[in-house]
Design a protein with these regions (language model features):
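A short acidic, glycine-rich active-site loop
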Residues: 52-65
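Short beta->alpha linker loops
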Residues: 50, 85-89, 111
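Small/aliphatic-rich secondary-structure junction motif
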Residues: 1-52
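Aromatic/hydrophobic pocket-lining residues that form π-stacking "cages" and hydrophobic walls in ligand
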Residues: 20, 70, 94, 128
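General small-molecule cofactor/ligand-binding pocket signal
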Residues: 34-36, 82-86, 137
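Structural beta-alpha unit
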Residues: 72-106
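Gly/Ser-rich helix-loop-strand patches that form or flank binding pockets
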Residues: 96-140
């Protein structure tokens, strides 16, 4: 089973990663986990003002923060794990990576910030669920 789990450095994404690892261990031999961090692009014009190198450093720092927490949660797992970082619209990038890697299951954390905020702004998890045929497990 190929499991894709999204991380952002938060406690809830660490919980989602631990859940994905547990699932992979219980599944058939050959299961693997891809740990994905997606950083949204900077606002238009920012790169022009601060420079390409500063934007690259900003994204690198964000990826490092997300993966630092993930690596701590991984410990000494026997499950094959690969880290993937990307820059783009979060939900769309998650879906693209999942499709490219022929993912069998998506595991995501939900911050549960409330129904009103979810209706007004939309959440990444609800966008992903609405646009995929891949099974999705939401961890809270």
């Amino acid at each position: 089973m190929k499991i894709l789990v999204t991380v952002d450095g938060s406690d809830i994404s660490t919980r989602a990663l631990k859940f994905a690892l547990k699932l992979a261990k219980q599944s058939a031999t050959g299961s693997s986990v891809t740990v994905l961090h997606v950083d949204p692009p900077v606002f238009p014009g920012v790169e022009r003002r601060i420079g390409k190198e500063a934007v690259q450093a900003y994204h690198a720092d964000n990826h490092a923060h997300a993966f630092k927490a993930a690596r701590k949660a991984l410990g000494r797992t026997q499950v094959p794990v690969e880290e993937v970082s990307a820059i783009g619209e979060i939900a769309g990038t998650i879906l693209a990576v999942a499709a490219k890697r022929k993912t069998d299951l998506l595991v995501m954390g939900s911050h549960g910030r409330g129904a009103v905020k979810g209706v007004l702004l939309g959440s990444v998890s609800s966008k992903v669920i609405a646009q995929t045929t891949i099974p999705v497990t939401i961890v809270r």
